[in-house]
């Protein structure tokens, strides 16, 4: 499904989506923020969305999705736009699911996912969440652990999506 098209065509839905998931869709793909030419990346891509803290979502040359946080963390987070939207919608605050020690097996991941989801849902406007899910034509129930496993697999797939900061002294710092 073309979720981005749906969001671009419905500004009210896009505003609700941004409020719930901290995901502001750009009007069109743009060059990535390269900090005045001092940052380079391991894969080509374009920025297509931002979050409220200054992070960027990048569609990479192979169609997968990368993310660069304002703190300098960089990596692939989804294999496709559809996988990204599922990650955002079903894990709500995907940044809160990054404890790699919880991804050892599906049982551990399911317990972690359920615990985090219940906590996040307790302070999320779930009535608006339901409206957004319905407007996007997505099921209201999903196995969060399955979505998180796809996230983990994308993040660890080679080649890794990395950023590099070019220091004034000529050295390069990966992030």
PLM feature segments, named:
Residues 89-92, 108-113, 125-137:
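Short, surface-exposed, charge-dense and proline/glycine-enriched linear segments
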Residues 99, 103-121:
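Hydrophobic alpha-helical interaction segments
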Residues 1-72, 103, 120-175:
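A surface-exposed partner-binding patch
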């Amino acid at each position: 499904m073309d979720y981005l098209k749906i969001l671009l065509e419905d500004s009210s839905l896009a505003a609700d989506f941004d409020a719930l998931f901290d995901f502001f869709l750009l009007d069109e793909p743009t060059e990535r923020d390269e900090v005045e030419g001092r940052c380079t990346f391991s894969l080509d891509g374009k920025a297509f969305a931002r979050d409220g803290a200054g992070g960027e979502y990048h569609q990479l040359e192979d169609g997968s999705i990368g993310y660069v946080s304002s703190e300098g963390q960089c990596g692939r987070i989804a294999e496709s736009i559809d996988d990204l939207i599922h990650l955002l919608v079903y894990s709500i605050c995907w940044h809160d699911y990054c404890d790699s020690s919880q991804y050892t097996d599906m049982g551990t991941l399911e317990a972690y996912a359920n615990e985090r989801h219940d906590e996040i849902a307790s302070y999320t406007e779930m009535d608006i969440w339901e409206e957004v899910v319905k407007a996007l034509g997505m099921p209201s129930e999903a196995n969060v652990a399955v979505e998180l496993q796809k996230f983990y697999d994308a993040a660890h797939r080679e080649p890794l999506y990395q950023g590099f900061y070019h220091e004034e002294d000529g050295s390069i710092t990966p992030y």
